[in-house]
Amino acid sequence: MLKHISSHIAMGCPQDECSICWESMPSGVGRLMPCGHEYHLACIRKWFHLHSGNRSCPVCRTEASVLVDTDHEVKIDLSVGQLLDFYGLLDEIGSQLLAITLQDHSTQDDEVNEEGLAEQRAQLTLVQCGICGEMNGDIDTCCNRCHHMYHHSCLGQLLVEVNAEREQGWSHCIFCYEQLVPLYISGARRVLSLQDRGVHRGRVRNNRSILTELIYERSGVLVHGIEDQHASQHDINDIEHSWHLLEQNRQRKQLEYQDKCKIQAHVRRILDHYYHCAKVTKAQYTFINKKVSQTLYALSRGVYPAVDLDYDGIAKTLILDEMEKLSS
């Protein structure tokens, strides 16, 4: 399978499916150089996060030096050292990152307030939801204390999943329990403005995570900043149990992608046999892999390995069922 994909690329043929998730790639494609293999940007970002320090192509194992966003023809240098600070990194790849600019700094005289300028530059950062990890303009809620940000819909979904009452935490940060406030976003300028440089899921990243967490892709979002409001106090003890459940669910979600990769390995191992025997086509392989893997995700109930599941046995049974349906 890998040799087939490699030769396909070598002949100059575009890939129609991501070799990590086996889904189509109509957009959001990243190409590794020099090997030329293509993946969903989100998939290759997660792959590199799971294999920290390893920049090898998942298909051919060639060391990648550049990742190209094919939608925008943006090239990202993957060899930038991890010891560079955040602004050094921006200087290194700034010319490649679409139109990222700092806020205008204007004064009525020729004197420059260096302290004010430094404070202004420190606001150039990026936004990521503390629950789902996505970075987009739909993030609408933030915490003034720890600076985590969320989609309002993600907060609601978490409460539903743990059977918590809406008043028990709908409007509070799941990390520090502070009451959340609206995050005002405008598209007037192409600036990302946050207030923290720590490295944490759902927070600002100053070190080099892959593509600096796709900062160039989201460079059209301006966060005007978080209003200096004093959140009202609340009784943490009343919702302590809910927060415990929410934190458990958050940790489970962080492991979910890794677990899915492991579960898919069971499915692909069996499917590879049928594919090499020419019993399933490439399209059928992709369809069956996705459907059977999703069934195993559901059966696992967020835990891998589930002690009561024979993954290989169940995968084989489900695969044969799907093959029979496709042949009828």
Swiss-Prot record:
It comes from Eremothecium gossypii (strain ATCC 10895 / CBS 109.51 / FGSC 9923 / NRRL Y-1056) (Yeast). Coiled coil: none annotated. Required for tolerance to alcohol. GO terms for biological process: ubiquitin-dependent protein catabolic process. SMART domains: RING (SM00184). Keywords: Cytoplasm, Metal-binding, Nucleus, Repeat, Zinc, Zinc-finger. PROSITE patterns: ZF_RING_2 (PS50089). This is Alcohol-sensitive RING finger protein 1. One of its GO terms (cellular component) is cytoplasm. It holds the Pfam family zf-RING_2. Gene3D superfamilies: Zinc/RING finger domain, C3HC4 (zinc finger). InterPro entries: RING-type_E3_ligase_ATL (IPR052788), Znf_FYVE_PHD (IPR011011), Znf_RING (IPR001841), Znf_RING/FYVE/PHD (IPR013083). It is found in: Cytoplasm; Nucleus. GO terms for molecular function: ubiquitin protein ligase activity; zinc ion binding. A zinc finger (RING-type) spans 18-61, 129-177.
